[in-house]
Amino acid sequence: CSFERIYFSRGSDVDIYKERKRLGEKLVPKILKAINNDIDHTVFSFIPNTAEVAFYGMLQGLDDYLNEEKVQQIAALGHNPNMEELEVILSRRIRSEKVAIKDIKLRTFIAEGNSRNDLAAHVYDITYGSLVPGVDNLVIIDDSIVRGTTLKQSIIGILDRLGPKKIVIVSSSPQVRYPDYYGIDMAKMSEFIAFRAAIELLKERDMKDVIAAAYRKSKDQVGLPKEQMVNYVKDIYAPFTDEEISAKMVELLTPKGTKAKVEIVYQPLEGLHEACPNHLGDWYFSGNYPTPGGVKMVNQAFINYIAVSYTHLRAH
């Protein structure tokens, strides 16, 4: 199970340490795109504490990229380079800071419901003076973005206080789109920010018929043996790219009054598989459950979601 390795397993295990580092490294091309390759005006950081190892992997990948740039710049100087020009090139560094500080006495996932929201605002603080306001981008890596509660209630707001030109939030795992039924407490569809974003996109683009069709097909197979059931929740995501869903998440999670431009970058599924080649269990990201029971449960979770959110569909 890959999510367990990203989030729950002990980071002291050598294989898990290497996998988490690779997850950070795999994100470098997407991060560079998000900041228009402007390394000189970007500060890199992480959400403490579980994302720290992926952060080191990301820094390693960025160092490799910067070294390639330096080689090309030095080569362009010719056979008799000017010392000052060389010094300018060699002085370029990846700028990393500990921007967010976590109060270790508090943990958002301990609290349930409304108390979780109250907690979220008090878990993090920031280091002032860690970037140049209005000039620098801020790239901050987290291990996963599941509900988005802490981002909305706390993190984006406090990072914005530093005055970055752009905030890029990077998830070392892919978009969590489906519930887990094998020991991790993630059972309701409405909890997932990826699912909420896809539903919003369907509404916006006048594609509510996709929701109705997925519901009808899910309802029609309730009496079937679980081995014959299909995960029709995939139809909710099918019309959109990962980037479209991420962009809608930004709209849903960015608090009013945020001055910086915000972007969310997720690990692609292929990046996850390359980083964790021996642990391909990815059902919360892909919807490919390892047992028929998982398909039956996600089917029911979607029906339950419609029952609460779309009373007019329930009658069909």
PLM regions with names:
Residues 95, 137, 165-168, 263:
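Residues at the starts of beta-strands that form the adenosine-phosphate
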Residues 1-36, 113-118:
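Active-site-facing substrate-recognition patch
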